[in-house]
Amino acid sequence: LLVLLSALPLLWPDVPPLLDLPGHMGRYRVQLDGSTSPALQHYYSFEWRLIGNLGIDLLVMPLAAVFGLELAVKLIVITIPALTVAGLLWVAREVHGRIPPTALFAVPFAYNFPFLFGFVNYALSMALALLAFGLWLRLARLGHTRLRAMLMLPLSVLLWVCHAFGWGTLGVLAFSAELVRQFDRGRGLFMAGLVAAWHCLALAPPIALMLLWRSSGSRGVTADYLNFDAKLDWLRMALRDRWEYFDQTCLALTGLVIFWAMVSRRIHFSRNLAASVLFLSLVFMALPRIVFGSAYADMRLAPYLVAVALIAIRFPEGIRPGFMKGVAAVALAFVLVRTAAATVSMVLYDRSFDRNLAALDHVPPGARLVSFVGRNCREPWAMSRLLHLPGMAIVRRHAFSNDQWTMAGAQLLDVRYRDAWPFMRDPSEVVTPRPCRREVWLTANEAMAHFPRDAFDYVWLIDPPPFDPGFASDLQPIWRSGTSTLYRVPRPKLDPKLRRTPSAG
């Protein structure tokens, strides 16, 4: 029931309102229709490569053929929290022999900040890593270590292809669990570590794939090590959604539960999962902010670290049933409150998405569209999640959008439309009310003044900051909702050969 309940917040929105997801959906559209759409061929190129970040990119191929792209993405994204909850509860059951009531406090971490940020391949890989870890523990408990090795060889490759971080996390979890298992069988710590490493060789094949990927010309950098102030912020934001005090109170409650387990004589931690928490903590501290050009690498691990600590709490056999029921009631209430809040938050974000996406009804197929999305130098707790909404212009209109990510070796998509320079790619869609330190974002005035008029047919402003209206005096407004506006650029005419109605879905 908890697995099914975790899908509830995402049932209503037609486009899951996750920050980066519309941008990814734009790439999926190019991937699916780029070979048959003259407009998409003109604006973008797409080249398949084996990289450790292909989870949903591969899943949409068969599902979009059946359901259409938008519904296919929604169905996949809905499964991510459900799989995460299933993985957490399975691991708890394998370690404790039953699901302790405190494990329920980990359930809301399925809707963690990295997931809401739109790191969907990462979140999917972490959900699958938890499920694979549950299988690892079960087969060890049953004594089927040879079967486990045979299964983990292909599973590790599939997990790496989904996202390399999920594979790495599974390796950390598996090694720590096997270390404790070997230690409990009477081996010294050093020998237990060697034997655990031997068992984990079944997870090693993706190392060759990683080396091949990194030697193929990827320019992704790794940087910003040991930024402990940021790491504390990432922990504080583990449940970040919409209401700061509510989210912080909920996180504080889970912190109190963990602290209670540390000092209580009634309950304690499983040594198996305590070792996992220790190793994950070391990885979290050592991870830089940027890995292979992928930002927020350490931030992504923070909520899973807390969730594993929660499922590590163990109740001894002789504890009173009434006490267990009381803890279970509090934990279940916590799950229901967080689920209700996440559902309301998703509905509100969905309204914001729908209000702005109405502009696309006025954009012809194949249009050359430049978009500017407002944000502040310092984002409020409740992020707007609109920064990559322009990607939906690719999905629904086969239009050009300047929000796509490009990085040699790390992205499958590249931008061909050089006339748009420097408004070709992310983050040229971001505009701010004033210059921001250490950022390359333009102010709204700079963007409106300098985008090349002859390269675009339409300008889409999405919740922009105030700007000098004189910079839009040569543009024709054709749609408006609040401060969001769609302008037509009068002079350029759309090349007739690019007018092709996109397929449904």
Residue positions per predicted region:
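Transmembrane catalytic cores of multi-pass membrane glycosyltransferases
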Residues: 13-24, 35-37, 44, 52-53, ...
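Short hydrophobic/aromatic helix or loop-helix immediately within or flanking a transmembrane segment
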Residues: 26-33, 44-69
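Transmembrane-helix motifs of polytopic, lipid-linked glycan transferases
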Residues: 75-95
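Transmembrane-helix signature of polytopic, membrane-embedded enzymes
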Residues: 88-110
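Short acidic/glycine- and proline-prone juxtamembrane loop motifs at membrane-interface regions
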Residues: 117-124
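Signature aromatic-anchored transmembrane alpha helix within multi-pass, membrane-resident enzymes
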Residues: 254, 311, 315-340
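Hydrophobic/aromatic-rich transmembrane helices and adjacent perimembrane loops
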Residues: 292-318
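Short periplasmic/luminal acceptor-recognition loop of GT-C membrane glycosyltransferases, typified by
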Residues: 349, 359-439, 449-464, 487
